[in-house]
Amino acid sequence: MFIDKQTVERHFSKSAHLYDGVNHVQRKMAHRLVQLLDEKRRDAKDEPRAILDIGCGTGWLTRECLKSFPQATIDAVDLSKQMLEVAEKNVSSHPNVQFIQGDIEKMVREKPSAKTYDVIVANAVFQWLDKPTETVAQLRSWLKPNGLLLFSTFGPDTFYELHDSFQLAAKQLGIIDERRGLDYLSKTEWKRTLDGLFAELTIHEEKAIESYATVEQFLHTVKKMGATYSQSSRPLSKRYYQLMKEIYEQRYRTEDSIPATYDCLYVLCQA
C-alpha cells in the first residue's frame, strides 16, 4: 500500500490547531493505551526510563506518559512540524521531552537507533504507514530486553456506514465504487504477521461509536482531523456524493443523529 507522505503531512499540518477540538476518539485511544501499559507494568520492578512516542501529534499521549512515568525521558516524533509546535506548547516544553520531526519508516529503514527504549508507543498512527507490519518488525531492534511496543490503530470496520453508503450509491448509479480512505489491517492480519517476532503478542479490539448531527458534520469533523486521505484516483461527482449522503441518512439515522463506527485495535508486543 503506497501512502503519499507529503499529502499526509500537509493535511495534518493544516489541521494542527484544530485537532484537539475534534479528536475525541483518538484521545480515548491514548488513554486506553496508557491504561494497558500501566496494567502490563503493574508488577514491574522499575519504571520505564526511555520512551519513544511515534506520531505524537499534538502531544496528548506524550502528556499521558509523563503523568504515569514522570521520571522518564520521551522522544516524541511526528511527520508534521506544525503538529510538533502545538505539542511542545501542550507539554509546556517539558525538559524530559525531545521533539523530533521525521518519518518513522525512513528512520527505522535508513539507520539503526542510537539508543534503545523501554517502551515504544504509537496512537492511531500505523494506518498511515506504507509498510506497517515491516516497520513494527524493524522497531523490535529499538527495544531494550523485555521492552514493550504498544500501539493503537484502526481496523477494517472503521467508518463501515460510510463505505456501505458509497457502495450502494455506486450500485444505484451503475458505476464502479473505489474504496475511499485507507485500507486497514484486521486483528487477524496483524496477529499473523507479528506472530513469532515478539516474546508476547496481545491484541484487543474495541468498537467506538461517535454520533453526529448530520453526515456533513461527520465528514467535516474528519477533515478537521486531517484524516481525509484517499487512495482513489477518481474524482467524486456531486451526484454520487449527494446520493451517498441520502443513503447514509436513510439507513443509519437514529432520532437525532447519525453514527460513525471506529474499529479500534490495541496491540501489545513484548521483546
UniProtKB/Swiss-Prot annotation:
Its EC number is 2.1.1.197. Pfam families: Methyltransf_23. Belongs to the methyltransferase superfamily. It is an enzyme of class 2 (transferase). This is Malonyl-[acyl-carrier protein] O-methyltransferase. Keywords: Biotin biosynthesis, Methyltransferase, S-adenosyl-L-methionine, Transferase. The keyword S-adenosyl-L-methionine applies. It catalyses: malonyl-[ACP] + S-adenosyl-L-methionine = malonyl-[ACP] methyl ester + S-adenosyl-L-homocysteine. Pathway: Cofactor biosynthesis; biotin biosynthesis. Gene3D superfamilies: Vaccinia Virus protein VP39 (3.40.50.150). GO terms for biological process: biotin biosynthetic process; methylation. One of its GO terms (molecular function) is malonyl-CoA methyltransferase activity. Converts the free carboxyl group of a malonyl-thioester to its methyl ester by transfer of a methyl group from S-adenosyl-L-methionine (SAM). It allows to synthesize pimeloyl-ACP via the fatty acid synthetic pathway.
